[in-house]
Each structure stands twice: as C-alpha cells, then as structure tokens.
C-alpha cells in the first residue's frame, strides 16, 4: 500500500496540511481510491484513447495507450463489456458509434467506497 499526497512542497507542514485537507490518493493492489479531482488526472496522465480507423463492418478502432504500471480496468455497463488497458502497452478495442458515447466505469478507481470513477472514452483523447 502507498499513499500519494498532493502537497505544495515536501515540508512537514505542507504534507500535514495536505493530509488534513484530504488531498491524497490511496494505492494498493493496482487500485486507486480518492477524490475525483485527484484520481481522474492520474488516469488522464496514464491512459489516452485515439481513433485509429474503421473496420469493414463500420466499427471504430480505438487504441487505448497506457503509459503507467497500473492495468486500468474499464467496464461499459450498457454492453457488459470489459476492457483492460494493460501496463506500458497499447490495447486495441472496436466499438460502434453509439458505444463511443457510453460512459465507462474504471473498475479499479474508487471515488467513494461504493462508486467507481466514470469516464467517456473519447474524453481520454489528447
């Protein structure tokens, strides 16, 4: 287990202030837990989504590139589809136009004990 603390500097006072202000994210067993304003930027710094083409059947090819060591697990509740952006790799997934607008759950990021981070795939584009 590890705690990421978002302090203004590395002084004891700044770290204490950040902890009391709850500017931290817990990390354990490839799972992040913290406030949305802290975990979402970590995901966005780690994973990008890019449309790379279309198949003959009209599906959109999307490259999920993960530059971190955390395997992010995405779920699309509308289709019961699971996707994993493996560490330090690019994962390709194929979706139709409607699926691109769905909201995904990030199964290994918690913003509350009972709630996963939600994100739209195209919002990960840079």
Language-model segments: which ranges?
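Charged catalytic cores and adjacent phosphate/nucleic-acid-binding surfaces used
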Residues: 1-126
């Amino acid at each position: 287990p590890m705690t990421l603390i978002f302090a203004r500097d590395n002084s004891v006072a700044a770290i204490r202030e950040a902890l009391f202000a709850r500017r931290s994210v817990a990390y354990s067993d490839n799972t992040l837990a913290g406030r949305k304003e802290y975990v979402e930027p970590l995901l966005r710094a780690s994973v990008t989504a890019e449309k790379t083409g279309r198949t003959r059947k009209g599906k959109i090819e999307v490259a999920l590139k993960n530059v971190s060591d955390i395997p992010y697990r995405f779920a699309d509740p509308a289709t019961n589809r699971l996707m994993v952006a493996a560490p330090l790799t690019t994962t390709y997934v194929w979706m139709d136009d409607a699926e691109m607008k769905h909201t995904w759950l990030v199964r290994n990021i918690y913003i509350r004990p009972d709630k996963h981070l939600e994100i739209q795939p195209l919002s990960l584009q840079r």
